Amino acid sequence: MKVLKILALTFSVALYTATILAQETKLIPLTTNSEKALELMRTVMANAEEFRGDDNPPLLEEILRLDPNFYFAKTYNSLLLENNTYRTNLNNAYENRSNVSEIEEKIIEATYQQYINLNTILADKIIDDLISKYPEYYQIRLVSADLKNDLKDPYAKDLRYAEILEQNPNSFPALFRRAQLHFQVDNSVVNFPIEERDLNLATSFLLKAASIQPKNPGPQRFLGNVYRGQNNLSMAKQAYESSRLLMGEPDEIDSRYSNILLMLGHVETFSGNYKEARKLYDESLEFLDFKQKPNLYQYPVFTYFYERDYDQAIVAFTKMRSEILNSNEDAQWKTVNSILMEENIFVSHLHNQDEQGANKSLQQLAGFKRNDLNSYLTSGASREQLLTIKNNNDIDLQELRLWKDIIFGASNLEQQLNRLKTLLEKNLAQDPNAMTLYHKYSGYAALMNGDNQAAIRHYSTVSDIEMDDDNYHSYFYALALRESGDTEKSKIIMKRIAENTFATRGAALVQMLAKRQL
């Protein structure tokens, strides 16, 4: 591992130098007493922008060893950091923000507001104001674009990339990220509504990015997503293989290489080759540190959902939950990832029509959520922060209770929906899209109760941005439309779900159902 860290340091510094010469753009000021730490931090930022973020954990360790008071560096999280350590770093940076440049100070404030106070709206305003004062720094606009993403505003996000490209038409990070507004990436990346996506434009952005950095595997990797968006799985496979060739031989731990194997697994999944997909998914896991595995581990298990083999899914998720709980990782990491596995176990019980199993799983989840809250109690979180975290945990549990009650036909759905609504309303000051969940489950409940018009009314309240890629609720929306006589629109949605080539839990649960509806 030490050798890998040294190689990462050497290779990344060389790439950083080449990038700066190519871009010749103004970089934000950084405050440190170490020239070497400054050089490495510039490298970290370039890596994050240019699909080399895997190199950053050892660099960030070295930066804080060289200068323990490099406060801006403390805003960067890392696989090597425990959650409590990162919170401590960020609190320390916030307390000392007056000791750095104004630009660093405001980015520290914004990061603190989003991560510690869970207030993305305020973080977004801080960065917007900073751009007004310092419009020449593209890196501030990249921070802003990330916040617009978290606020689920693809238009404002796209505008930030357009502004960067107006200043520098050859900005790799802006071209690379702007393309991703036009196709699915993962659940954390917001996209344009389907009707406004332009895969040809996305392709042009990626090809230009590739011409700027021809050895960067990122553009080819995401061209694979473009082809999947066109349902051209053979071309997607070729693009992913091209990206793999650009990467060369993988390191022992190599999440970029792992991600390419994951993409190739997706190609096999949507070709109906589930055994081959599971082989590729399992191979991709071999290139990950254990802390990285739980999220990716879901994908091979989701293939059982397509086969309606929920018992096998429960066995697999239970196995990973045990491995997580028996690992040597920190307690909070174990709790968060046990929640992830247990939620999948719960969903498997739901769709296996096992109410007793779902109830038992829900009790487990409630216990894990209590442990999660307790971990914040001991980390120095303020009362306001604890109340927000508790409310979010209550929302998660209430959503699952409601989901269960809808599927098993409980009589108290209105009461359960009102409870969810009350919890979500508390978040409106921090999340303008907070009520989306309420309308989705209200639509679902109305459909199950035979009130198709109410279902359509609630689902229509949800923006296309948040509805289009939600295959699960789109399926029930399509059913409501069909039952109300709008067969044309229903068929369009069903066809989109049936032909989907992007792997999510919701898609895995309903795709085969949608195919049978056509």
Map each language-model feature to its residues:
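TPR-repeat structural position
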Residues: 53-54, 87, 119-120, 154, ...
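Single-residue signature of alpha-solenoid repeat helices
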Residues: 56, 86, 123, 157, ...
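Structural motif corresponding to the intra-repeat A-B loop/turn of tetratricopeptide repeats
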Residues: 50-51, 77, 84, 116-117, ...
